Amino acid sequence: EVIFKKYSPLGELGEFAGVYAEVLGKVLTTPVLICDRDHVIAAAGLPKKEVLERRAAPALEEIMESRQSYILENPQSSPVYAVEGYDRPAVAVYPILAAGDVCGAVILSAGEDRRQPSEADRKLIAAAAMFLGRQMEE
């Protein structure tokens, strides 16, 4: 019996992405998720089995396809749920771009306090997405 698994270039960085997510989660004290185009491949700041391998929600796919970041500007606006079956909304999403192609996203999830991301939070998430994209190009 042969089982085919969809190839994910970002999946090759799985262990590396996991360490990066862990460090970001500790610095930001907020849950951080890293996804390839289809699934969560790394998480920190929450029980990993709660989110690993879960599918990217249509809202996340739209953000990635737009190649634009998403920032929760107004806590009263309707929330964006980035991962199917995960009940915390995203407060910041930055697509991971490698050689002009979208290969995933770094997601800052709402913490217990559901605060808006600070400017420093945004820059750290953006740096993570850019760094992972650059690693993909190597």
Question: PLM features: residue spans?
Answer:
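Short, structured interface segments
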Residues: E1-L10
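A short, flexible beta-alpha/helix-coil linker loop
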Residues: V2, I41, A110-R114
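Structured interaction and signal-relay segments at domain junctions
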Residues: V19-Y86
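Short hydrophobic/glycine-rich mini-motifs in sensory/regulatory modules
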Residues: I96-V106
